[in-house]
Each structure stands twice: as structure tokens, then as C-alpha cells.
Amino acid sequence: MTALAVAPVTAKDATPSKWLVFLHGILGSGANWRTFARQFVAAKPEWGALLVDLRLHGDSQGFAPPHTLEAVARDIVEALPTVTGGAPVRAVLGHSFGGKVGIELARQLAASPNGPLDQLIVVDSTPGPRPDHRGSSNVRHIVELLMQLPPEFPDRTAFTAWVEERGVNRPIAMWLAMNVRPVPNTTRFEFRLDVPSIRTMMDDYFVQDLWPVLENPPGHMATHLIAGGSSEVLEAADLERGRTLAGTTVDVVPNAGHWVHVDAPDTLRELVLGYLGG
């Protein structure tokens, strides 16, 4: 059976009584949230953080189809009992692709032995469909570019040069290079992600409508929608729709784009600490 990679983060000498699950965006990994998670558990040592590598990302490779949002969430539900030590998952934070996975995960957890979440935090991700890929054209372009990758490179530098020559800026190229690994029994390197299957996951993400989960939340779950002030992912109509829902809060971080945790980590941390009890 293929195992999902989940890394626990706890405060020093602490035994968590509850967990916050972090879900990354497309082409990312749980490690993207490690610094944020460490700061969170230092402030709230009764909580532990679980950094998930979603299927086909990071160290969670080899998963079979279907590559759907429902399957991505189910992977997590099945993996949690092996890493929680019996303490419940009480909150989920998901960014971008991970935000919508988080909504589906909340739905599935409610029907599992874990039970409903207390808090769901969705960072710059709309619950509804986006057939026009609004706000995600850059990521979509990168995925399409990666579909054209040569099978191997002499080294990581050659990989970053290849993507930079095709218009990807250096910070993104270096971030993508984290997924370049040696080819076994050779001196060459390859991009280890299954890009065609990741594109399939993105296609499902863009067509799913999960507003009904927020309109009829499981148990007493509170939902918090966070938008980057200069991001186009959440439209004004999305924010207004969120504000009309009982049990849902909406916050806009004015000094942030789509990557809220990179652009305004302190603001995001204060919001999360406030949601989870100060």
C-alpha cells in the first residue's frame, strides 16, 4: 500500500492534545509550511501540526488513479490514525489547491472516527468552480511547461536553466528544483513529480463546487476564508457569499498576494492564533 508522507511538528517536550493539519498548494510540499508550523506550536504547545505531502507531491509518490480532490482527501483520512497518537484533528489549514482539499477533508472527517473539525482555515482558495482558472494562470502555465521537460538533466543547475530560459523567474525555478532527484544508478537527474497526473488533479480542482459544505457545515465547524488583497483567486462575490454564511468569517490581508504565508506571515499567524483561541 502506498503511504502518504505526514511530518508531525510539536513544541519542545510537548505532547499535543489536538492537531492542526497543513495542506500545501499544487507543486508544493508540506515543508513549505514548516517554519509557520514551528512558530504556531511554539505559541500554542497544546497543539501539534501535521505537514502533509499531498498525493503525487513531495515524498507521497506512486498513488494510483483516480487523481481527484475526493481521493486526495481520502488519502489523508486514511493516514491520520497512524500519526496522531490518538489525539483528534481539530483544525485544518489549506492554501490554494490545499484549501479546497481542506474543505473536502472536513466533509470526510465528519463521517470518520475523528469526527467533525472545530475550525477550517482556507487561505486564498475559492470553494466554488473556476473554469477560467482565474488567479491561477501562472501556476497553470508552469504545469503546462513542466509537461515538456526532458526526461533527464546532467544536474539541478541544468534544470533551473531550462525553466528560466522559458520565462520562469529564478525563485520559482529554485523552488521547483526541490523536486529534482538523482536517477538511480546514474549520474543524471530527473524531475520526480508525475506532472500529467498533477494536471488531472488540477482539472478536478477547478470544476468542483464545495460551497455546499460551508453552507451546511458538519457539526459546529467554523470556517475562515482568508484572501490575499492583491490576489485574483477570490472575487468580491466570493467574499460576499462567505460573509452571508453563518459560522464563516472572511478576512482580507491587504499587503499580500496569493502566497499569503510568504507575503504576510505575521499577519496570517495572528489570524490563525485568533481563530484557534488566542
Could you describe each region identified by the protein language model?
Residues P150-F206:
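Conserved alpha/beta-hydrolase catalytic His-Asp/Glu region
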Residues T2-T10, V41-L93, F97, V101, ...:
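Active-site loop/oxyanion-hole signature of alpha/beta-hydrolase fold enzymes
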Residues L27, L54-G58, P127, G257-V260:
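Alpha/beta-hydrolase active-site loop signature
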Residues R107-Q108, N114-F153, F159, E235:
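Flexible "cap/lid" loop of the alpha/beta hydrolase fold
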